[in-house]
């Protein structure tokens, strides 16, 4: 799993990685096996506003998926278990009565050669 920002584990709010099967790199997260226990990483952005995007490639299935948001995010969480991985891009909303705001999320699913 790749992110468009530097990942700094020392800035995470919470880390749950009981089997140590999730490995954190500078801009990517890799797995050294299939986690049988739940894992969770809170606040991958370290509280800094970043471009909201991620890309996940399954090498065995030769398929990729990515998400890009039209907003800035200051919080990205990552949760997973067994064959599930769930990146969460948070969008902080503050609007007054009568105001409106718009944002979008685009997902792309593709084959990998």
Role assignments for model-derived ranges:
Residues 1-17, 111-113:
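Acidic (Asp/Glu-rich), glycine- and aromatic
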Residues 11-15, 19-24, 32:
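Conserved functional micro-motifs across diverse proteins
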Residues 24-113:
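Beta-strand-rich recognition/accessory modules
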């Amino acid at each position: 799993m790749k992110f468009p920002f530097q990942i700094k584990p020392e800035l995470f709010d919470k880390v749950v990685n009981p089997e140590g099967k999730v490995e954190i790199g500078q801009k990517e997260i890799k797995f050294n096996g299939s986690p049988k226990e739940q894992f969770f990483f809170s606040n991958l952005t370290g509280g800094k506003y970043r471009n909201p995007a991620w890309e996940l490639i399954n090498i065995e299935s030769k398929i990729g998926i990515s998400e890009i948001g039209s907003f800035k995010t200051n919080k990205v969480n990552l949760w997973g278990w067994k064959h599930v991985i769930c990146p969460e891009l948070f969008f902080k909303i503050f609007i007054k009565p009568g105001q409106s705001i718009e944002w979008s999320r685009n997902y792309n699913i593709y084959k990998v050669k």
